[in-house]
Design a protein with these regions (language model features):
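Short boundary/hinge segments that flank catalytic cores
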Residues: 1-97, 103-120, 124, 129-132, ...
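NTP-binding/hydrolysis catalytic cores, primarily Walker-type P-loop NTPases
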Residues: 127, 167, 198-200
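Well-ordered beta-strand positions
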Residues: 97, 182, 205-208, 236
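Conserved G/P- and acidic residue-centered "switch" motifs that form tight phosphate/ATP-binding loops
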Residues: 81, 102, 186, 204
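Inter-motif core of Ras-like GTPase G domains
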Residues: 195-213
Length: 239
């Protein structure tokens, strides 16, 4: 089984020429811990360092006017929400205004990462009813840094794919861009539902997360399809 999975950056480099933003050390945090934010202010451990390096590489790849970063992966359990959340915290500590948006509307992973309850309204409530909902009323402070806010996925709608296909999504993202330096979208695994491919239209960059000994090599190769279809202006991998 393990031969079939990605083991390290060497494997990734054999499978694709998409640049690698960084390789995270294995995290000792059990998922039962309160949230899984490991980046803390003024703390220098290996995880911290790695996310700082990740942040530097990310900012280097983005042009000044590129603010929207989409995070995806091949399948669930690859650490996509973990990477999104911690990179967001790292950017916030750099003094950037950041909002993380839970676009994996079917299975909200951000709630776990930030230790928030599942039953709150979020982006889906705005997309369903943009006339009556104020988007910024649905945004909540992260409680971690004053620079970081969270916009959860919200109520699970009967038709997530149709919902994210509406041009209301563009309107929502434009509003967020007017108030934040960076908008991070935590989306569904791209191999599983079409939502993420549809959401790609509002993103400047895709960070594709894979996990050592979890992500199958065959499935990971889908990243080359994303590269060849030019769905994203920029594309990079985190292991």
């Amino acid at each position: 089984q393990r031969q079939m999975c990605i083991r390290d950056s060497g494997d990734v480099e054999q499978l694709t020429n998409v640049p690698i933003l960084g390789e995270l050390p294995l995290c000792g945090h059990k998922s039962s811990d309160k949230g899984t934010i490991v980046v803390r202010e003024n703390k220098n451990d290996m995880m911290e360092e790695t996310f700082r390096g990740l942040r530097t590489n990310l900012l280097f790849m983005l042009r000044k006017d590129q603010k929207v970063i989409l995070f995806s992966s091949t399948q669930p359990g690859e650490g996509k929400s973990f990477v999104t959340g911690n990179l967001a915290v790292s950017l916030a500590y750099l003094g950037k205004k950041v909002v993380v948006v839970g676009m994996d509307i079917r299975k909200p992973g951000l709630n776990k990462v930030f230790d928030l309850s599942k039953r709150q309204e979020g982006i889906s409530n705005y997309l369903m009813d943009p006339e009556d909902k104020d988007l910024f009323d649905l945004v909540q402070p992260s409680g971690i840094s004053p620079n970081l806010d969270i916009l959860l996925g919200g109520t699970i709608p009967p038709n997530p794919t149709e919902l994210v296909a509406r041009d209301t999504l563009e309107k929502a993202i434009e509003q967020l861009k007017s108030r934040y330096d960076y908008v991070l979208l935590d989306t569904a695994p791209i191999g599983m539902v079409t939502d993420t491919a549809i959401i790609s239209r509002v993103a400047d960059m895709c960070v594709y997360v894979c996990r050592a000994d979890v992500t199958p090599k065959a499935a990971f190769c889908y990243i080359n399809v994303l590269r060849d279809e030019h769905k994203f202006d920029k594309l990079a991998v985190v292991i």
